[in-house]
Amino acid sequence: MGNVPAKETRSRSSSSVSDYRNSTSSTTHGSSSSTSSKRRNTTSSLYGIVSSATSSSNHHNRSGSHDLRKLKRQEEKEQAQIQHYMQLIVKFNESVDGGYLAPFGTYKSNLDYDCDIVRNLIINRKLSPFFTPLQDFDESWTDDELCILLGQLTLHALEPGYNNDDDEEEDDIDNHKIHKSANYYKRQEEKAKLKSLINKVKELQKDEEQKYFDEKQKNFNKDCPSRDLLLRLYRNASECPICFLYYPKHLNISRCCLQPICSECFVQIKRLDPHPPHDDQSNQEAGELPHRLISEPANCPYCASPDFGVTYEPPIDIHTGIDGIKPGDYRVSPPIVEESESAIDDDGDNSSNGSTTGKGEITSNSATAAAAATATPPPVNSISPKKNSLKKRRGSLAANAPGVITIDMIRPDWETKLNSARSKLARKAATASAIHASNLLLDDNSNSNSNNGNGNNSGNNRRRNNSSSGRSGSFGGSNNRYATVEQRMIEEAMRLSILDEEERKRNANKENKK
């Protein structure tokens, strides 16, 4: 009996055993639950690593493709620039009616016209070629004196005929800054490439000049103009009213006021850069921005008529160079002069008399006529002075008339530049509107906070008691402000997009009406 535990002892011991069992079971359950949670965490972490790696690879692929496209566009731009400058080289074997396909070099700037379009217009005889100009001309010069002077002319101006020289290079604003901008080094690299390209073009032009001089000394190259061709072109030279240089009289004629202009001056005329309208704003269309950019057509340098254009009538007795005979094969033929009716009657009487005199005289007269016809063959495109003097003077032509070459035809990228400038201005306006809207919201928030700060202590106690709700409310307010700013930015972008689309439709309608 003495070894049997008491009632209190039995209860305590049993309770301790049960507690041990409960603690053991709880420990086992806790360990199993922790193990399962670790497994879940490991699985989720592995999934996160895989997903992050996948997204990272996708991001790298997208960025890589974007860089490749950007690099390709840059290469295409550089190739187009190289091709443009190579087409500005004057080559003596690329001539049309005594002129050339590239400018002489009177001007050093504004050579950004489309060379392919201008070359095709010259080859098709729709635009006057680039003739080599004379600094002075005197009608009293003899043919020998004029030929000596023409023989000393070069293909291109002796002075550097291209811009971006060291003395005319534009000063970069970042040159005076300690911290350079992000695009500074890129601009410097592009300037260095352009300078190298221009130096290369100058060397190629010098080689072409030397080749032309050597061929003239040999005096048997058919690509060099003959004496007859030079005299035919420059015997009655005319002065260009803009550059005051003397060219062959076959120049472009303005469509509006019928004034002559050389091709060298014609390609210099261009539209102004996109700018805000400077006229009366009362005629501005509804919904249009007050700082909307426009691009006005080029005006005539003589009469200031809008949408300047020219026409060209090629000489009918000269067809040398491309799609014609060699310039060295050109020979002047005497023009056919119309005979009067009395002369024809006299010839008829003489022929009748000759027929009655005898058979031998008839044979001799026919032989003489055949010999004369063989010695002086009639020119293909020659006309009589009488018909030429009766040519009627034409009036002004419309800009879209057949045969009219406008400034926009040789610079067709003006609309692309205008749209680019408008998009840039729209982005600036949207950014300014977003900043203005955010400043308004911040001002409203500061005013509300200052009004709340003027309250009594009970308000402070309520804020201390409701600190958690206050924090959540502040987060909600900031999110609402950001959402409002974003919404305003989206609305502004949509409004600008709608205005651009309306402007495009108006321009399309105007073009269709024309």
UniProtKB/Swiss-Prot annotation:
Residues 1-79, 340-396, 442-481 are annotated as: Disordered. GO terms for biological process: cellular response to glucose starvation. It comes from the Eukaryota. Residues 340-349 have a biased composition (Acidic residues). Residues 64-79 have a biased composition (Basic and acidic residues). Residues 12-36, 445-481 have a biased composition (Low complexity). Its main location: cytoplasm. It is found in: Cytoplasm. One of its GO terms (cellular component) is cytoplasm. Keywords: Cytoplasm. Belongs to the SIP5 family. May negatively regulate the SNF1 kinase. This is Protein SIP5. It comes from Candida albicans (strain SC5314 / ATCC MYA-2876) (Yeast).
